[in-house]
Amino acid sequence: SAASDVYKRQEFNQTVLHKILKANDLQFTELFEAEPHIFISNKNPLAEKSAVTMQELQPYPYLSFEQGEHNSFYYSEEIFSTEIRSKNIRVRDRATLFNLLIGLNGYTICSGVIDEELNGKNIVAVPLREKGSMHIGYITRKQSIPSRLGSIYLDALKHYAKNT
């Protein structure tokens, strides 16, 4: 089934990433686990739904970030990156992605965490009715001590994660 394929892919992706982190003396610190959502324009016909399926997203363009030329299939940020979509657009920055979400009625898959103060009211998060979870966190060198500003930033992230 598609759900078990996603789970196997995520499990393999996690194994590959753990090996790379270990080999480079890095560690991942999880802030929280999130259920998959989509970001869409508040004018998109799906914006009023309590949750959407991948099937309902088929007519809309899927927007994702370019991963760079040294991209590996196993580094993919998107939880459902193996899903076949008829319309794919890759962007390099968040502003372009949000402009295309609004202008083309596109969507992207995300954690559901959005800040209205930062992003305005034009973009909304809608839960995705698919199995899976996203591990949100940060990567640091093992045994490194963050700078004063780094510590302030990490404390702000942890506080934000607790309150979302």
Task: Identify the function of each model-found stretch.
Residues 14, 54, 58-83, 147-148:
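Secondary-structure junction motif
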Residues 1, 64-65, 83-93:
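Short beta-strand-to-loop elements that line the ligand-binding cleft
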Residues 21-35, 95-145:
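Beta-alpha-beta core module
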Residues 2-7:
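Short, small-residue-biased leader/transition segments that mark boundaries at the very start
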Residues 21-36, 40-62:
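Flexible hinge/capping segments at coil-to-helix
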Residues 74, 145-159:
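Short amphipathic alpha-helical coupling segments at ligand-binding clamshell hinges
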Residues 43-52, 130-132, 143-149:
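Short helix-loop capping/hinge motifs at secondary-structure junctions, enriched
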Residues 8-18, 41-42, 93, 109-114:
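Beta->alpha turn/N-cap motifs
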